[in-house]
């Protein structure tokens, strides 16, 4: 399997990286199949050979996470949602759903309480009318 990954070079504590296509079993700094670009994390300088990268991606090469981020910034591939982001968003969605259920439950309880209160008021009004009428008829 061909991977698109970074090959380190430069001085100690002043690392720069070359974006290379290489076999997934080869060493990090081993001989690459093709050099595709350059990345300096200190200055954020990035140079990409877009045609060669598109060709390698078309052949089925898999970019590493860091290279994927560089390619997304360069506009060569679409931004993808990674599993860690999905988990966080899933937790947030579950929390929102739970809050919505709780709010719906509270609204249903409030509605039921209002209906019960209205029914009690209607019964009280009937009860006031009925005993008065019964007492008058029993007295008269």
Swiss-Prot record:
Signal peptide location: none
GO BP term, pick one: translation
Q: Which organism is it from?
A: Parasynechococcus marenigrum (strain WH8102)
State where composition is biased (Low complexity). Answer: 115-124
Q: Which UniProt keywords apply?
A: Ribonucleoprotein, Ribosomal protein
Task: Keyword check for Ribosomal protein, yes or no.
Answer: yes
Gene encoding this polypeptide? rpsP
Renumbered to this chain, the Basic and acidic residues biased-composition regions fall at 94-114
What are the boundaries of the region Disordered? 86-140
Name of the molecule in the record: Small ribosomal subunit protein bS16
List where Acidic residues composition bias occurs: 130-140
The record ties this protein, via Pfam families, to: Ribosomal_S16
Q: A Gene Ontology molecular-function term? A: structural constituent of ribosome
Q: What PROSITE patterns does the entry give?
A: RIBOSOMAL_S16 (PS00732)
Q: Which GO terms describe its cellular component?
A: cytoplasm; small ribosomal subunit
The UniProt similarity line reads:
Belongs to the bacterial ribosomal protein bS16 family.
